From Swiss-Prot:
Function text: Nucleotidyltransferase involved in the post-translational modification of proteins. It can catalyze the addition of adenosine monophosphate (AMP) or uridine monophosphate (UMP) to a protein, resulting in modifications known as AMPylation and UMPylation.
Cofactors, names only: Mg(2+); Mn(2+)
The name this protein goes by in its record: Protein nucleotidyltransferase YdiU
HAMAP family: YdiU_SelO
Any one Gene Ontology molecular-function term assigned to this protein's record: ATP binding
Annotated EC: 2.7.7.-, 2.7.7.108
Source domain of life: Bacteria
Keywords: ATP-binding, Magnesium, Manganese, Metal-binding, Nucleotide-binding, Nucleotidyltransferase, Transferase
One matching Pfam family: SelO
Length: 505
């Protein structure tokens, strides 16, 4: 099995470069990518740099804000040590297989290793055409760019595994979508951009040699502990199943709807990736769909765990030639691994839901207690985020009931549930102060409300960016009360409600 370190092309001189690139994926066979330079833009202007993330990656934020840094972030200049490529992958899109997708408007500049020794990709999104662009122009409008910046950084602040956003650049050019819009480029950071669809790309071609090379690379980079397993490829699959089950549970605990859970948007590192038509639930409805292209609700909120499990089954199909005998035994092993998804998901979900309800001890009936609350919320139009936040003040003080009751169309529905909840809380050994502190740490006050994101996008399209910057700052502290910004916690008024979201590609 190949080792990641053997593929590194870093030299001592690279360490002093403004961006300390240490590239490995670009040393894989050329079937994995196309070498391509970003397309230059007319008048790049820096909109935002994520200073904290830059420092984590051992990049001086001052460089990124300099003329040379802006030139690199806009694709107008190639930084020393960068080896730009567009990655190849395939994917199932809404259940239909497409044998070649790939980075049609994104270019991987290279990789860096952070201060803790963890490797990250640095990628430009909206940086021009590649051979995978099909009929696209390779560009991005400012709306999808700032949407991904807002939501990915909010997810990180919520503690949910996610790709990150390092910078946003305005291109000074216009892009044509349903109307003419200002262009932008996002600098995305990810543990990697290896997707289920990356494995499907080689499996669909019967290219077992490169499939094995890809699996070896992924194991060395993300799951090195499985190298010593009797069947490392099966152990690799088991690890990805567990990781993605836990990730999907985290989504369900904050009311996040990805919107386009295709296999090419499923990262094997277990990070949330590709935020196109994503949204957060306001009033709780388990069947909620926002994405304009999800006409049949395939990726509705309640369907997300099943969608991820389906994607993992496709991942298993791609890996079959590497597992066991590659035949009947491999299928048997893969099926057993997929069957474990529900156990991983249920354990993570119930553990998270217990904390949201102030429960520490594991007791029978806890899942039913949580499910009953969600049913009552759905029937009474209760806001998902605000209900759980308000419970923090009601767990040990009935004076807090009024705030929760006010979120229910029929307050008696909450009254009936809260009797059971308080009875269950009485079996805990925590002090009220400890319980409240713990609940406040997992039940956010602030999420990226859809109407707030849309307001930031509208302002940005008009050349006003204050809303974007303020929203990013508020969402960086989602568990703090922030009285000055209390309005950001409120659900939309009827005229503000966002009913559909769009990819914007």
């Amino acid at each position: 099995m190949s080792q990641l370190a053997e593929k590194s092309c870093v030299t001592p001189a690279d360490a002093a470069a403004p961006i300390p690139f240490d590239n490995t994926y670009a040393r894989m066979p050329e079937a994995f990518y196309e070498r391509v330079k970003p397309a230059a833009v007319a008048a790049p202007r820096l909109l935002r740099v994520n200073d904290a993330l830059a420092r984590q990656l051992r990049i001086d934020p001052a460089f990124l804000k300099s003329p040379q840094g802006v030139a690199v972030l806009s694709g107008n200049e190639i930084a020393p040590g960068s080896d730009p490529i567009a990655q190849a992958y395939a994917g199932h899109q809404f259940g239909s297989f497409v044998p070649q997708l790939g980075d049609g408007r994104a270019i991987l500049l290279g990789e860096v290793v952070d201060a803790a020794g963890k490797r990250f990709d640095i990628q430009l999104k909206g940086s021009g055409r590649t051979r995978f662009s099909r009929r696209g122009d390779g560009r991005a409008a400012i709306g999808p760019v700032i949407r991904e910046y807002i939501v990915s950084e909010a997810m990180a602040a919520l503690g949910i595994p996610t790709t990150r956003s390092l910078a946003v650049v305005l291109t000074g050019e216009q892009v044509m979508r349903e109307r003419v819009l200002p262009g932008g480029i996002l600098t995305r950071v990810a543990s990697s951009h290896l997707r289920v669809g990356t494995f499907q790309y080689f499996a669909a071609r019967g290219d077992v040699e490169n499939l094995r090379a890809l699996a070896d690379y992924a194991i060395a980079r993300h799951y090195p502990d499985v190298c010593s397993a009797g069947d490392p490829y099966l152990a690799f699959f088991d690890a990805v199943v567990a990781t993605l089950a836990r990730l999907s549970a985290r989504w369900m605990l904050v009311g996040f709807i990805h919107g386009v859970l295709n296999t090419d948007n499923t990262a094997i590192a277990g990070e949330t990736i590709d935020y196109g038509p994503c949204a957060f639930i306001d009033a709780y409805r388990p069947d909620k769909v926002f994405s304009s292209i999800d006409q049949f609700g395939r990726y509705a909120f309640e369907n997300q765990p099943a969608a991820v499990a389906w994607n993992l089954a496709r991942f298993a199909e791609a890996l079959l030639p590497l597992i066991a005998d590659g035949g009947a035994k491999a299928i048997e092993c893969a099926n057993a691994s997929i069957a474990a998804f529900d156990d991983h998901f249920n354990a993570a979900y119930l553990s998270g839901m217990r904390r949201k309800l102030g429960l520490v001890r594991e007791m029978e009936g806890d899942l039913e207690l949580a499910s009953d609350l969600l049913t009552r919320m759905s029937e009474n139009g209760a806001d998902f985020t605000l209900t759980f936040r308000a419970l923090c003040g009601a767990a040990d003080d009935t004076k807090g009931d009024a705030e929760v009751r006010g979120l229910f169309a029929d307050p008696s529905a909450f009254d009936q549930w809260t009797e059971r909840w308080r009875q269950r809380l009485s079996l805990e050994g925590q002090s009220a102060e400890v319980r409240r502190t713990d609940m406040l740490s997992v039940n956010p006050m602030f999420i990226p409300r859809n109407h707030r994101i849309e307001a930031a996008i509208r302002d940005a399209e008009a050349g006003r960016f204050e809303t974007f910057h303020e929203l990013v700052e508020v969402l960086s502290h989602p568990f703090d009360d922030q009285p000055k910004f209390a309005g950001y916690a409120k659900p939309p008024r009827p005229e503000e409600e966002v009913r559909q979201t769009f990819c914007g590609t």
